[in-house]
Curated annotation (Swiss-Prot):
It is an enzyme of class 2 (transferase). The porphobilinogen subunits are added to the dipyrromethane group. Tetrapolymerization of the monopyrrole PBG into the hydroxymethylbilane pre-uroporphyrinogen in several discrete steps. This is Probable porphobilinogen deaminase. Binds 1 dipyrromethane group covalently. The modification S-(dipyrrolylmethanemethyl)cysteine is found at C240.
Length: 304
């Protein structure tokens, strides 16, 4: 059996495809595959993400990749789960969740191993994520937050050139690329990650042969935790453009979920933490609590 795998052409995306195929071949060593790279709207966009979101261009990094699956040009699309909207095309589904890599955000600074609280006043910190921007402003209103675009290598080069004093990235991306950089992991209680961060997923056509195949090897723990986190996002509203963080952990047979929503300025912040049995149930309860306590309106900004 041979399958065609669609993904973005970035170094990180192709590394994620490599991780997916390695995982797949553990179960199906005779499987053959072909990788199809797709140039996406998000890759080609030059405008700030907030502006793109206002135009309704959500799902910037997955739309054309999934289109290849819908059109039959590929059997599977490989994504970082945090880039996927909570609502997929009804003809598609997430068939497999890989074991989770570290879900946390990290701070990389020019001056050394600084935590966010160690940065000097007025330091310029780079990110284009609404969640990260709001969290930085909440924790350190004396810092300057500046948009940061490009792939991981480009972002690190901009840091080295002195355009920023520090940048915030997903630890999973840094780890997957095997980058030799010093960083400080940000406390998830203060700096909660994007829902689903650290998880690679495979999207397929519903009811397809490959969908059934992948479901048989999906990581149960990853799927459970991702479902809890993404249910908060879905029920609260706003997709991957809302300033919302969530992280879930297994505690025996239960799930502990912490979720945070912030105003764009970071001045208003609501944190909730709940324990429940079912991932959807605990996610829905967390979203309801956030809605009840939320005194502000949220805004847009990419999670890439």
């Amino acid at each position: 059996m041979k399958i065609k795998i669609a993904a973005r052409g970035s170094k990180l995306s192709l590394k994620q495809v490599s991780m997916f195929t390695s995982y797949l071949l553990k179960f199906f060593p005779d499987l053959e595959y072909e990788v199809i790279t797709v140039k996406t709207t998000g890759d080609k966009a030059n405008a700030p993400f907030e502006e793109l979101a206002k135009r309704g261009l959500t799902g910037l990094f997955e739309k054309e990749v999934n289109k290849a699956v819908l059109e039959g040009k590929a059997d599977v699309a490989v994504h970082s789960l945090k880039d996927l909207p909570t609502e997929l095309d009804p003809r598609l589904e997430i068939a497999a969740f890989l074991p989770r890599d570290p879900p946390y955000d990290v701070l990389i600074s020019r001056a050394g191993n600084y935590d966010i609280f160690d940065l000097p006043k007025g330091s310029v910190v780079g990110t284009s994520s609404a969640r990260r921007k709001a969290l930085i402003k909440n924790l350190r209103p004396d810092l300057v937050v500046k948009d940061l675009r490009g792939n991981v290598d480009t972002r690190l080069e901009k840091l080295r050139r002195g355009e920023y004093d520090a940048i915030v990235l997903a630890e999973a991306g840094v780890s997957r690329l095997g980058l030799n950089v010093d960083y400080v992991r940000l406390d998830w209680r203060l700096f909660p990650p994007s829902p689903g961060q650290g998880i690679i997923v495979a999207v397929t056509r519903k009811g397809s042969e490959i969908s059934d195949l992948l479901k048989s090897i999906s990581d149960v723990k990853s799927e459970k935790l991702a479902t809890a986190e993404r249910t908060v996002l879905k029920e609260f509203g706003g997709g991957c453009f809302v300033a919302l963080g969530a992280i879930a952990f297994e505690e025996g047979s239960l799930i502990r979920l912490r979720a945070t929503v912030l105003s764009p300025s970071g001045r208003e912040r609501v944190d909730v933490e709940l324990i429940g049995k079912g991932p959807e149930e605990v996610g829905m309860r967390a979203a309801e609590r956030l809605k009840a306590l939320n005194p502000m309106k949220t805004t847009v900004g990419s999670e890439e």
